[in-house]
Amino acid sequence: MRTFNRRAVLGGASALALTASFAAAAPRPAAAPKLPARGNVVIRNAYVMTMDAAGDLADGDVHVRDGAIVSVGQKLAAPGASVIDGRGMIVMPGLVETHWHMWNTLLRGMSAAKPDNGYFRTSAGLGRVFEPGDMYQGTRLAAAEALHSGITFVHDWCHNIRGPEFARQDLRALKESGLRARFSYGPAQGHDLKQTIDLADLEKLKSEWAQHGNDGLITLGMAWRGHGGNQPANAVPENVWRAEYDAAQRLGLPISVHSSGSKSAVGQIGGLDKAGMIRNAQIIHAVYATPEEIAAMKAAGSTVSLAPTSELRIGFGIPPTLSFLDAGIPVGLSVDTVTLVGNADMFAIMKTIQGLENGRAENEYRITARRVVELATIEGARSMGIDNKVGSLKPGKRADLIMIDTRAANLGVFGDPAVMLVTAVQPANVDTVMVDGRILKRNGKLTAMNVAQIAREAANANLAVRKRANWW
Protein backbone atom coordinates (compact mmCIF):
# COMPACT_ATOMS: atom_id res chain seq x y z
CA MET A 1 0.00 0.00 0.00
CA ARG A 2 1.26 3.46 -0.84
CA THR A 3 2.17 5.69 2.05
CA PHE A 4 3.49 9.20 2.10
CA ASN A 5 5.58 11.25 4.44
CA ARG A 6 3.40 14.12 5.65
CA ARG A 7 6.37 16.11 6.84
CA ALA A 8 7.94 15.96 3.38
CA VAL A 9 4.77 16.33 1.36
CA LEU A 10 2.69 18.77 3.36
CA GLY A 11 5.44 21.15 4.35
CA GLY A 12 4.61 23.63 1.63
CA ALA A 13 6.33 26.59 3.25
CA SER A 14 9.46 24.55 3.90
CA ALA A 15 9.50 23.28 0.35
CA LEU A 16 9.31 26.80 -1.02
CA ALA A 17 12.17 27.80 1.24
CA LEU A 18 14.34 25.17 -0.43
CA THR A 19 14.17 26.92 -3.79
CA ALA A 20 17.85 27.84 -3.74
CA SER A 21 18.96 24.24 -3.26
CA PHE A 22 16.47 23.09 -5.90
CA ALA A 23 17.99 25.54 -8.36
CA ALA A 24 21.35 23.93 -7.81
CA ALA A 25 19.81 20.60 -8.79
CA ALA A 26 18.56 21.84 -12.15
CA PRO A 27 20.19 20.08 -15.08
CA ARG A 28 22.90 22.01 -16.83
CA PRO A 29 21.47 22.93 -20.23
CA ALA A 30 23.19 20.82 -22.82
CA ALA A 31 23.38 22.13 -26.33
CA ALA A 32 19.76 22.59 -27.37
CA PRO A 33 18.56 20.18 -30.05
CA LYS A 34 18.73 21.89 -33.40
CA LEU A 35 15.34 22.49 -34.95
CA PRO A 36 14.86 21.73 -38.64
CA ALA A 37 15.27 24.68 -40.97
CA ARG A 38 12.27 26.39 -42.49
CA GLY A 39 12.28 25.63 -46.17
CA ASN A 40 10.43 25.83 -49.45
CA VAL A 41 7.92 22.95 -49.55
CA VAL A 42 4.79 22.11 -51.50
CA ILE A 43 2.33 19.41 -50.46
CA ARG A 44 0.58 18.03 -53.54
CA ASN A 45 -2.63 16.13 -54.25
CA ALA A 46 -3.99 16.03 -50.69
CA TYR A 47 -7.48 16.59 -49.37
CA VAL A 48 -7.07 20.09 -47.95
CA MET A 49 -9.33 21.34 -45.14
CA THR A 50 -8.55 25.04 -44.97
CA MET A 51 -10.97 25.74 -42.07
CA ASP A 52 -11.39 29.06 -43.85
CA ALA A 53 -14.05 30.55 -46.10
CA ALA A 54 -12.24 28.92 -49.03
CA GLY A 55 -13.56 25.57 -47.83
CA ASP A 56 -12.11 22.16 -48.70
CA LEU A 57 -10.09 21.21 -51.75
CA ALA A 58 -9.87 17.69 -53.14
CA ASP A 59 -6.51 17.03 -54.81
CA GLY A 60 -5.25 20.28 -53.34
CA ASP A 61 -1.79 21.74 -52.86
CA VAL A 62 -0.31 23.84 -50.07
CA HIS A 63 2.87 25.83 -50.73
CA VAL A 64 4.97 26.87 -47.72
CA ARG A 65 8.09 29.02 -47.79
CA ASP A 66 10.16 30.53 -44.96
CA GLY A 67 7.56 29.61 -42.34
CA ALA A 68 4.54 31.13 -44.09
CA ILE A 69 1.76 29.76 -46.26
CA VAL A 70 2.36 31.12 -49.76
CA SER A 71 -0.66 29.67 -51.54
CA VAL A 72 -3.41 27.06 -51.32
CA GLY A 73 -4.99 25.68 -54.48
CA GLN A 74 -4.63 23.08 -57.18
CA LYS A 75 -1.66 22.45 -59.44
CA LEU A 76 0.25 25.31 -57.83
CA ALA A 77 3.43 26.64 -59.34
CA ALA A 78 6.10 26.31 -56.65
CA PRO A 79 9.53 26.84 -58.24
CA GLY A 80 12.36 25.16 -56.38
CA ALA A 81 10.11 23.67 -53.72
CA SER A 82 10.61 20.22 -52.25
CA VAL A 83 7.53 18.09 -52.90
CA ILE A 84 5.61 16.11 -50.28
CA ASP A 85 3.19 13.58 -51.73
CA GLY A 86 -0.21 14.26 -50.19
CA ARG A 87 -2.11 11.39 -51.79
CA GLY A 88 -4.22 9.60 -49.19
CA MET A 89 -3.69 12.45 -46.73
CA ILE A 90 -5.88 15.08 -45.12
CA VAL A 91 -3.99 18.36 -44.75
CA MET A 92 -5.45 20.70 -42.14
CA PRO A 93 -4.40 23.37 -39.66
CA GLY A 94 -2.47 22.17 -36.64
CA LEU A 95 -4.56 21.53 -33.54
CA VAL A 96 -4.78 24.39 -31.04
CA GLU A 97 -4.69 23.37 -27.36
CA THR A 98 -5.83 26.08 -24.93
CA HIS A 99 -4.99 25.00 -21.34
CA TRP A 100 -2.57 22.30 -20.20
CA HIS A 101 -0.62 21.83 -16.97
CA MET A 102 2.31 20.44 -18.91
CA TRP A 103 4.67 20.00 -15.97
CA ASN A 104 2.53 17.29 -14.41
CA THR A 105 2.78 15.08 -17.47
CA LEU A 106 5.61 13.63 -15.38
CA LEU A 107 2.79 12.23 -13.20
CA ARG A 108 0.86 10.68 -16.08
CA GLY A 109 -2.01 8.45 -14.98
CA MET A 110 -1.16 8.71 -11.28
CA SER A 111 -4.55 10.05 -10.24
CA ALA A 112 -6.39 6.99 -8.95
CA ALA A 113 -9.91 6.41 -7.68
CA LYS A 114 -9.44 6.88 -3.93
CA PRO A 115 -9.47 10.10 -1.91
CA ASP A 116 -5.88 9.66 -0.74
CA ASN A 117 -4.49 9.67 -4.28
CA GLY A 118 -6.98 11.61 -6.38
CA TYR A 119 -5.86 14.31 -8.77
CA PHE A 120 -5.55 17.32 -6.49
CA ARG A 121 -3.83 15.42 -3.70
CA THR A 122 -1.46 13.70 -6.12
CA SER A 123 -0.44 16.83 -8.01
CA ALA A 124 -0.03 18.81 -4.79
CA GLY A 125 1.75 16.08 -2.86
CA LEU A 126 4.23 15.28 -5.59
CA GLY A 127 4.44 18.78 -7.02
CA ARG A 128 5.77 20.06 -3.71
CA VAL A 129 8.91 17.95 -4.03
CA PHE A 130 9.61 18.81 -7.67
CA GLU A 131 12.99 20.23 -8.55
CA PRO A 132 13.61 22.49 -11.57
CA GLY A 133 14.84 19.60 -13.68
CA ASP A 134 11.54 17.80 -13.11
CA MET A 135 9.73 20.72 -14.69
CA TYR A 136 11.92 20.32 -17.76
CA GLN A 137 11.32 16.57 -17.92
CA GLY A 138 7.54 16.84 -17.52
CA THR A 139 7.09 19.64 -20.04
CA ARG A 140 9.48 18.06 -22.54
CA LEU A 141 7.49 14.80 -22.39
CA ALA A 142 4.27 16.78 -22.85
CA ALA A 143 5.73 18.67 -25.81
CA ALA A 144 6.77 15.43 -27.50
CA GLU A 145 3.27 14.04 -27.04
CA ALA A 146 1.74 17.25 -28.36
CA LEU A 147 3.70 17.04 -31.59
CA HIS A 148 3.03 13.32 -31.92
CA SER A 149 -0.70 14.06 -31.54
CA GLY A 150 -0.91 16.86 -34.11
CA ILE A 151 -1.00 19.73 -31.62
CA THR A 152 0.97 22.72 -32.90
CA PHE A 153 -0.01 25.30 -30.25
CA VAL A 154 -0.15 24.71 -26.50
CA HIS A 155 -1.19 26.92 -23.63
CA ASP A 156 1.20 25.88 -20.87
CA TRP A 157 -0.68 26.84 -17.69
CA CYS A 158 2.23 26.49 -15.31
CA HIS A 159 1.10 26.23 -11.69
CA ASN A 160 4.16 24.78 -9.99
CA ILE A 161 6.63 27.66 -10.15
CA ARG A 162 8.49 27.17 -6.87
CA GLY A 163 11.22 29.61 -7.80
CA PRO A 164 12.64 31.40 -10.86
CA GLU A 165 14.53 28.37 -12.19
CA PHE A 166 11.33 26.30 -12.28
CA ALA A 167 9.84 28.67 -14.83
CA ARG A 168 13.05 28.79 -16.87
CA GLN A 169 13.36 25.01 -17.07
CA ASP A 170 9.76 24.69 -18.19
CA LEU A 171 10.38 27.32 -20.85
CA ARG A 172 13.57 25.59 -21.92
CA ALA A 173 11.55 22.47 -22.77
CA LEU A 174 9.02 24.49 -24.75
CA LYS A 175 11.70 26.33 -26.69
CA GLU A 176 13.62 23.16 -27.58
CA SER A 177 10.46 21.50 -28.90
CA GLY A 178 9.69 24.10 -31.57
CA LEU A 179 6.03 24.31 -30.53
CA ARG A 180 4.05 27.52 -30.73
CA ALA A 181 2.94 28.29 -27.19
CA ARG A 182 1.74 30.63 -24.53
CA PHE A 183 3.47 30.19 -21.18
CA SER A 184 1.22 31.39 -18.37
CA TYR A 185 3.13 32.07 -15.16
CA GLY A 186 1.34 30.89 -12.03
CA PRO A 187 1.74 29.84 -8.40
CA ALA A 188 3.33 26.73 -6.91
CA GLN A 189 1.59 23.66 -5.58
CA GLY A 190 1.02 24.34 -1.88
CA HIS A 191 1.43 28.09 -2.38
CA ASP A 192 -0.03 30.08 0.51
CA LEU A 193 -3.32 31.49 -0.77
CA LYS A 194 -2.65 34.63 1.27
CA GLN A 195 0.56 35.35 -0.63
CA THR A 196 0.88 36.63 -4.18
CA ILE A 197 2.84 34.71 -6.75
CA ASP A 198 6.40 35.93 -7.34
CA LEU A 199 5.46 39.14 -9.14
CA ALA A 200 9.04 40.42 -9.10
CA ASP A 201 10.23 37.35 -10.97
CA LEU A 202 7.33 37.60 -13.40
CA GLU A 203 8.40 41.15 -14.22
CA LYS A 204 12.02 40.03 -14.56
CA LEU A 205 10.98 37.19 -16.87
CA LYS A 206 9.11 39.61 -19.10
CA SER A 207 12.15 41.89 -19.26
CA GLU A 208 14.35 38.99 -20.44
CA TRP A 209 11.74 37.46 -22.74
CA ALA A 210 13.98 37.68 -25.79
CA GLN A 211 15.91 34.75 -24.28
CA HIS A 212 12.81 32.57 -24.04
CA GLY A 213 10.34 33.58 -26.73
CA ASN A 214 11.93 31.59 -29.57
CA ASP A 215 11.60 34.43 -32.08
CA GLY A 216 7.94 35.02 -31.28
CA LEU A 217 6.78 31.40 -31.13
CA ILE A 218 6.29 31.57 -27.36
CA THR A 219 4.43 34.38 -25.60
CA LEU A 220 3.92 35.17 -21.92
CA GLY A 221 0.72 35.32 -19.89
CA MET A 222 -0.49 35.04 -16.30
CA ALA A 223 -2.07 31.92 -14.81
CA TRP A 224 -4.22 33.93 -12.44
CA ARG A 225 -5.85 32.34 -9.40
CA GLY A 226 -8.72 34.79 -9.25
CA HIS A 227 -10.94 33.96 -6.28
CA GLY A 228 -9.38 30.54 -5.87
CA GLY A 229 -9.87 28.47 -8.99
CA ASN A 230 -11.66 25.24 -8.15
CA GLN A 231 -11.68 26.07 -4.45
CA PRO A 232 -14.52 27.84 -2.61
CA ALA A 233 -15.40 31.19 -4.09
CA ASN A 234 -13.41 33.40 -1.69
CA ALA A 235 -10.40 31.17 -0.99
CA VAL A 236 -7.91 33.80 -2.21
CA PRO A 237 -8.14 37.12 -0.32
CA GLU A 238 -9.09 40.19 -2.34
CA ASN A 239 -5.82 42.01 -1.71
CA VAL A 240 -3.96 39.05 -3.24
CA TRP A 241 -6.03 38.53 -6.37
CA ARG A 242 -6.20 42.25 -7.00
CA ALA A 243 -2.42 42.61 -6.72
CA GLU A 244 -1.87 39.76 -9.17
CA TYR A 245 -4.46 41.10 -11.60
CA ASP A 246 -3.01 44.61 -11.44
CA ALA A 247 0.48 43.25 -12.12
CA ALA A 248 -0.74 41.46 -15.24
CA GLN A 249 -2.42 44.63 -16.45
CA ARG A 250 0.68 46.71 -15.79
CA LEU A 251 2.86 44.22 -17.67
CA GLY A 252 0.40 43.90 -20.54
CA LEU A 253 -0.06 40.15 -20.05
CA PRO A 254 -3.16 38.16 -21.06
CA ILE A 255 -4.98 36.64 -18.11
CA SER A 256 -6.31 33.10 -17.79
CA VAL A 257 -8.27 31.89 -14.76
CA HIS A 258 -10.01 28.74 -13.55
CA SER A 259 -13.50 29.83 -12.57
CA SER A 260 -16.89 28.29 -11.76
CA GLY A 261 -15.54 24.88 -12.66
CA SER A 262 -17.13 22.91 -9.84
CA LYS A 263 -20.12 23.17 -7.52
CA SER A 264 -17.87 24.55 -4.79
CA ALA A 265 -16.90 27.39 -7.13
CA VAL A 266 -20.38 28.49 -8.20
CA GLY A 267 -20.63 32.26 -8.58
CA GLN A 268 -16.95 32.93 -9.18
CA ILE A 269 -17.44 34.34 -12.67
CA GLY A 270 -20.12 36.71 -11.43
CA GLY A 271 -17.89 37.86 -8.60
CA LEU A 272 -15.01 38.55 -10.95
CA ASP A 273 -17.33 40.38 -13.32
CA LYS A 274 -18.58 42.65 -10.53
CA ALA A 275 -14.94 43.49 -9.82
CA GLY A 276 -14.43 44.31 -13.52
CA MET A 277 -11.87 41.55 -13.96
CA ILE A 278 -13.10 39.29 -16.75
CA ARG A 279 -12.55 41.74 -19.60
CA ASN A 280 -10.69 39.90 -22.36
CA ALA A 281 -9.84 37.11 -19.91
CA GLN A 282 -9.78 33.41 -20.72
CA ILE A 283 -12.14 31.54 -18.38
CA ILE A 284 -11.25 27.88 -17.86
CA HIS A 285 -13.84 25.14 -17.22
CA ALA A 286 -16.84 27.41 -16.43
CA VAL A 287 -18.97 24.27 -16.02
CA TYR A 288 -21.37 26.09 -13.71
CA ALA A 289 -21.55 29.40 -15.56
CA THR A 290 -25.07 30.80 -15.29
CA PRO A 291 -26.93 32.45 -18.19
CA GLU A 292 -26.26 35.81 -16.55
CA GLU A 293 -22.54 35.06 -16.26
CA ILE A 294 -22.40 33.89 -19.87
CA ALA A 295 -23.98 37.18 -20.95
CA ALA A 296 -21.43 39.05 -18.85
CA MET A 297 -18.59 37.08 -20.43
CA LYS A 298 -19.83 37.97 -23.89
CA ALA A 299 -20.10 41.65 -22.98
CA ALA A 300 -16.60 41.62 -21.49
CA GLY A 301 -14.94 39.94 -24.47
CA SER A 302 -14.05 36.85 -22.46
CA THR A 303 -13.18 33.53 -24.05
CA VAL A 304 -13.55 30.04 -22.61
CA SER A 305 -11.43 26.89 -22.52
CA LEU A 306 -13.25 23.59 -22.01
CA ALA A 307 -11.69 20.30 -20.92
CA PRO A 308 -14.51 17.77 -21.27
CA THR A 309 -12.42 14.67 -20.69
CA SER A 310 -11.00 15.93 -17.39
CA GLU A 311 -14.26 17.56 -16.30
CA LEU A 312 -16.01 14.22 -16.71
CA ARG A 313 -13.17 12.17 -15.23
CA ILE A 314 -12.97 14.24 -12.06
CA GLY A 315 -16.73 14.56 -11.70
CA PHE A 316 -17.06 18.32 -12.13
CA GLY A 317 -19.92 17.94 -14.58
CA ILE A 318 -20.73 18.69 -18.20
CA PRO A 319 -19.62 22.02 -19.67
CA PRO A 320 -22.36 24.06 -21.40
CA THR A 321 -20.49 24.20 -24.70
CA LEU A 322 -23.41 25.22 -26.87
CA SER A 323 -24.49 27.92 -24.45
CA PHE A 324 -21.12 29.60 -24.96
CA LEU A 325 -21.17 29.11 -28.72
CA ASP A 326 -24.76 30.32 -29.05
CA ALA A 327 -23.75 33.45 -27.13
CA GLY A 328 -20.90 34.08 -29.57
CA ILE A 329 -18.12 33.43 -27.06
CA PRO A 330 -14.94 31.95 -28.60
CA VAL A 331 -14.39 28.42 -27.30
CA GLY A 332 -11.17 26.41 -27.25
CA LEU A 333 -10.46 22.82 -26.22
CA SER A 334 -8.12 21.76 -23.45
CA VAL A 335 -6.07 18.72 -22.48
CA ASP A 336 -5.90 20.06 -18.90
CA THR A 337 -3.78 17.35 -17.27
CA VAL A 338 -2.67 13.88 -18.25
CA THR A 339 -2.21 13.05 -14.58
CA LEU A 340 -5.99 12.75 -14.69
CA VAL A 341 -6.95 11.91 -18.29
CA GLY A 342 -3.90 9.91 -19.35
CA ASN A 343 -3.06 11.42 -22.73
CA ALA A 344 -3.25 14.48 -24.96
CA ASP A 345 -5.59 13.09 -27.62
CA MET A 346 -7.38 16.13 -29.06
CA PHE A 347 -9.36 13.89 -31.42
CA ALA A 348 -10.85 12.12 -28.39
CA ILE A 349 -11.61 15.50 -26.84
CA MET A 350 -13.47 16.50 -30.00
CA LYS A 351 -15.45 13.27 -29.93
CA THR A 352 -16.32 13.83 -26.26
CA ILE A 353 -17.58 17.38 -26.88
CA GLN A 354 -19.82 16.24 -29.72
CA GLY A 355 -21.17 13.28 -27.77
CA LEU A 356 -21.95 15.35 -24.69
CA GLU A 357 -23.80 18.09 -26.55
CA ASN A 358 -25.77 15.80 -28.84
CA GLY A 359 -26.63 13.58 -25.90
CA ARG A 360 -27.77 16.52 -23.81
CA ALA A 361 -29.92 17.78 -26.68
CA GLU A 362 -31.14 14.26 -27.56
CA ASN A 363 -30.36 15.29 -31.12
CA GLU A 364 -27.75 13.60 -33.30
CA TYR A 365 -27.21 16.80 -35.28
CA ARG A 366 -27.14 19.47 -32.54
CA ILE A 367 -23.42 20.10 -33.02
CA THR A 368 -21.79 18.90 -36.21
CA ALA A 369 -18.38 17.32 -36.61
CA ARG A 370 -17.31 20.27 -38.76
CA ARG A 371 -18.15 22.70 -35.95
CA VAL A 372 -16.21 20.61 -33.47
CA VAL A 373 -13.15 20.60 -35.74
CA GLU A 374 -13.41 24.39 -35.79
CA LEU A 375 -13.12 24.40 -31.99
CA ALA A 376 -9.83 22.52 -32.30
CA THR A 377 -8.46 24.83 -34.99
CA ILE A 378 -9.67 28.30 -35.99
CA GLU A 379 -12.06 28.80 -33.06
CA GLY A 380 -9.41 27.70 -30.59
CA ALA A 381 -6.96 30.09 -32.22
CA ARG A 382 -9.54 32.88 -31.95
CA SER A 383 -10.00 32.10 -28.26
CA MET A 384 -6.24 32.56 -27.73
CA GLY A 385 -6.03 35.72 -29.84
CA ILE A 386 -3.79 34.12 -32.49
CA ASP A 387 -6.29 33.57 -35.31
CA ASN A 388 -4.51 36.23 -37.36
CA LYS A 389 -1.48 33.91 -37.44
CA VAL A 390 -2.76 30.32 -37.33
CA GLY A 391 -5.89 28.18 -37.13
CA SER A 392 -6.65 28.05 -40.85
CA LEU A 393 -4.71 27.44 -44.05
CA LYS A 394 -4.67 30.83 -45.69
CA PRO A 395 -1.94 32.62 -47.66
CA GLY A 396 0.01 34.91 -45.37
CA LYS A 397 -0.61 32.93 -42.20
CA ARG A 398 2.15 31.00 -40.48
CA ALA A 399 2.58 27.43 -41.62
CA ASP A 400 1.22 25.40 -38.71
CA LEU A 401 -0.34 22.33 -40.32
CA ILE A 402 -0.70 18.58 -40.01
CA MET A 403 -1.19 15.67 -42.38
CA ILE A 404 -3.46 12.74 -41.47
CA ASP A 405 -2.81 9.42 -43.23
CA THR A 406 -6.21 7.95 -44.07
CA ARG A 407 -4.79 4.60 -45.19
CA ALA A 408 -4.43 3.12 -41.69
CA ALA A 409 -6.41 0.14 -40.43
CA ASN A 410 -8.63 2.31 -38.20
CA LEU A 411 -9.54 4.50 -41.20
CA GLY A 412 -9.13 2.96 -44.64
CA VAL A 413 -12.20 4.48 -46.30
CA PHE A 414 -12.88 8.14 -46.96
CA GLY A 415 -16.26 9.68 -46.22
CA ASP A 416 -16.93 13.07 -44.65
CA PRO A 417 -13.45 14.16 -43.53
CA ALA A 418 -14.72 16.14 -40.53
CA VAL A 419 -16.69 13.14 -39.29
CA MET A 420 -13.61 10.98 -39.76
CA LEU A 421 -11.48 13.39 -37.72
CA VAL A 422 -13.92 13.52 -34.83
CA THR A 423 -14.98 9.88 -34.70
CA ALA A 424 -12.11 7.78 -36.02
CA VAL A 425 -8.74 9.53 -36.20
CA GLN A 426 -6.16 8.87 -33.49
CA PRO A 427 -2.78 10.50 -32.81
CA ALA A 428 -1.03 7.57 -34.50
CA ASN A 429 -2.68 8.62 -37.78
CA VAL A 430 -0.82 11.95 -37.73
CA ASP A 431 1.89 11.47 -40.35
CA THR A 432 3.37 14.97 -40.57
CA VAL A 433 3.43 18.02 -38.31
CA MET A 434 4.71 21.44 -39.33
CA VAL A 435 5.08 24.38 -36.95
CA ASP A 436 6.04 27.76 -38.38
CA GLY A 437 7.26 26.00 -41.50
CA ARG A 438 9.49 23.53 -39.65
CA ILE A 439 8.71 19.84 -40.14
CA LEU A 440 8.70 18.43 -36.60
CA LYS A 441 7.06 15.09 -37.42
CA ARG A 442 7.42 13.19 -40.69
CA ASN A 443 6.39 9.69 -41.68
CA GLY A 444 5.00 9.23 -38.18
CA LYS A 445 8.28 10.05 -36.38
CA LEU A 446 9.36 13.18 -34.52
CA THR A 447 12.26 14.82 -36.33
CA ALA A 448 13.86 16.93 -33.57
CA MET A 449 13.08 14.99 -30.39
CA ASN A 450 14.48 11.63 -29.29
CA VAL A 451 11.35 9.98 -27.92
CA ALA A 452 13.15 6.98 -26.41
CA GLN A 453 15.55 9.23 -24.50
CA ILE A 454 12.76 11.57 -23.40
CA ALA A 455 10.65 8.68 -22.09
CA ARG A 456 13.60 7.07 -20.30
CA GLU A 457 14.65 10.30 -18.58
CA ALA A 458 11.06 11.13 -17.64
CA ALA A 459 10.60 7.69 -16.08
CA ASN A 460 13.76 8.17 -14.02
CA ALA A 461 12.61 11.62 -12.91
CA ASN A 462 9.19 10.25 -11.94
CA LEU A 463 10.80 7.60 -9.74
CA ALA A 464 13.04 10.20 -8.10
CA VAL A 465 10.06 12.46 -7.34
CA ARG A 466 8.12 9.56 -5.81
CA LYS A 467 11.12 8.55 -3.74
CA ARG A 468 11.53 12.07 -2.34
CA ALA A 469 7.82 12.13 -1.44
CA ASN A 470 7.77 8.50 -0.20
CA TRP A 471 4.81 8.07 -2.56
CA TRP A 472 4.27 4.43 -3.51
What kind of region is each of these model predictions?
Residues R2-G60, R65-K75, E374-W472:
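Active-site microenvironment of metallo-dependent hydrolases
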Residues A32-P33, E165-Y288, E292:
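Metal-coordinating catalytic core of metallo-dependent amide/deamination hydrolases
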Residues L106-Q137, Q231, K263-N280, A300-T303, ...:
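Active-site gating loops and adjacent loop-to-helix segments of metal-dependent hydrolytic enzymes
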Residues M110-L179, D201-N214, A458-A461:
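Alpha-helical scaffold segments that flank or form the walls of functional sites
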Residues Q249-G252, G276-A281, K298-S305, D326-V331:
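Glycine-enriched alpha-helix->loop->beta-strand junction motifs that scaffold or abut catalytic
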Residues K274-N280, L322-A408, T423-Q426:
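His/Asp/Glu-enriched, well-ordered alpha-helical/loop segment
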